[in-house]
A protein has these predicted regions:
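Non-catalytic helical/linker scaffolds that mediate oligomerization, partner binding
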Residues: 1-488
């Protein structure tokens, strides 16, 4: 079983039960839905189809997020306006109702003129066009094209190093978040997160509806990087989306930026996902480039929780092969035990005074020093499983969950295989039998096989309180004795 998880983006036009099953069998762990490219009806179709195939498959939905865009091009210009380097234009703010012309480029942020200083760079359409602000007055920016090209309607705008007054949650985002609450979604991946304030705005909506959906913060701009520590602290997990990030930052700094974010997430015991163009050539080709294989491998060597496919599975010609390729790369890289050393003796993972974190580290240390086959735990919220994942042990973690939501969210965590127990404990050891039965389906367990057990003496609500090492024979014998006592 691979330890690195795979997030696959799903589009409604190709989401059939057979297609979902093929991706799941190929190695997909989490389904992603991008609200920027799907309607609420389309998203509902995806969720219902996925959960008909397997209710345990988690769903992640991306918000569109606060972003700057050029308004619609005026009809007289057709689909685009061509600009050359040196051309001058005025840039003005708008509520979106004004049309862009050759003389005036409108952007969908009313405060754009006051927010952007003279000297700033504005990158349009992921950097295909670039303009520089050479002057301004109260109503408009005087701009000159540095890089020309065809400007089309609704293209994105990035302003590196400048903080723009954008709302934390757009009206469309709010509608989709409320939709997610009603439709059994597990993760909200919030786009263009700039600070903890943006996360709190999403959390306030979730709290108002009594939802336990987890927030994944997408790091896509310099402001998000500047506030990365507070964002990690406020989030359930982090997604490093290298597309927009690569527009704002020089390409050569992206690898170190990615590595630094991954290390911070592992330290904070937060799941981390690497995204954008990981196997992009497989949109049209049945095989990846060598550079793409190395990119995926590098992320896995960095010990990320998950790697993500976007266009490859949403619209590409080889979606199943893309997932299979990513899964093969993960399994091959994870065989390198000289590199994949557990993080039990490093200062990388924060333990502090948390009992669960101390127990998780002890269990991973035991599984490293003893011939233990699996680490087994039970969990109500998923926290114990997430903490065990942070120490990146070599042994698979079997997490027996008492709630479907806990099973789903743990599907995103490194090295964790979550299974569902339909009833809470009648005895503190009974969850081990469920784990053994599940493992027996994949591999015959010998009586002498050792297990590291992380459990609680005070029921699922009491949290983890002990680590125990036991062999399969003694676990089964103890369960037989407990069953016999209950039948008396």
């Amino acid at each position: 079983m691979k330890k690195t998880k795979i997030v696959a983006t799903m589009s409604d036009f190709r989401c059939t039960e057979e297609f979902v099953k093929q991706l799941f069998d190929a190695g997909m762990d989490v389904v992603r839905v991008n609200s920027a490219h799907v309607s609420e009806d389309g998203a509902t179709h995806i969720v219902e189809t996925v959960h008909r195939v397997n209710p345990a498959i988690p769903i992640m939905i991306d918000t569109k997020g606060p972003e700057i865009r050029v308004t619609t091009i005026a009809d007289e210009y057709g689909n685009s306006i061509n600009f050359r380097p040196g051309d001058r234009v005025a840039v003005r703010g708008s509520d979106g109702s004004d049309f862009t012309t050759r003389k005036v480029v409108y952007m969908n942020v009313p405060s754009i003129v006051s927010d952007i200083p003279v000297g700033a760079r504005m990158l349009i359409a992921d950097g295909e066009l670039e303009i520089r602000v050479v002057g301004k007055n109260d109503t408009e920016l005087d701009c000159e094209f540095v890089v020309g090209g065809a400007m089309r309607s609704r293209k994105s705008v990035n302003v590196p190093g400048v903080s723009i007054d954008l709302p934390s949650v757009t009206e469309k985002d709010r509608r989709f978040i409320e939709w997610a609450v009603k439709n059994d979604v597990d993760f909200i991946a919030h786009s263009f997160v700039r600070s903890a304030r943006d996360i709190r705005a999403v959390q306030d909506i979730l709290d108002a509806h009594g939802s336990n959906i987890k927030i994944i913060s997408k790091i896509e701009n310099q402001e998000g990087l500047d506030n990365i520590d507070e964002i990690i602290e406020a989030s359930y997990g982090i997604m490093v989306t290298r597309g927009d990030l690569g527009v704002e930052l020089p390409a050569e700094v992206i690898p170190n930026t990615q590595r630094r974010i991954v290390e911070k997430c592992i330290c904070a015991k937060r799941p981390v996902i690497i995204a954008t163009q990981m196997l992009y050539s497989m949109v049209k080709s049945p095989r990846p480039t060598r550079a793409e294989v190395s990119d995926v491998a590098s992320a896995i060597y960095e010990r990320v929780d998950a790697v993500m496919l976007s266009d490859e599975t949403a619209m590409g010609d080889f979606p199943v092969q893309s997932v299979e390729t990513m899964a093969r790369i993960a399994r091959e890289i994870e065989r390198d035990e000289t590199h994949f050393k557990p993080m039990i003796d490093m200062d990388m993972v924060s333990v502090n005074h948390e009992i669960t974190a101390q127990l998780a580290r002890s269990a991973v240390r035991a599984s490293t020093n003893l011939p233990i086959k699996y680490v087994v735990l039970d969990t109500k919220t998923g926290r114990t499983g997430r903490y065990l994942a942070a120490f990146r042990g070599r042994k698979t973690v079997m997490a027996v969950c008492y709630q479907l939501h806990a099973q789903r969210i743990l599907a995103l965590s490194y090295g964790v295989v979550p299974i569902l127990r339909n009833q809470e404990l009648s005895d503190r050891y009974h969850f081990l039998v469920d784990a053994l039965e599940f493992l027996d389906q994949y591999r015959k367990l010998d009586d002498g096989d050792l297990m590291a057990i992380v459990g609680g003496s005070f029921g699922p609500d009491g949290g983890a309180s002990y680590v125990e090492i036991a062999n399969v024979q003694n676990i089964r014998k103890r369960n037989e004795e407990i069953v016999a006592q209950h039948n008396c």
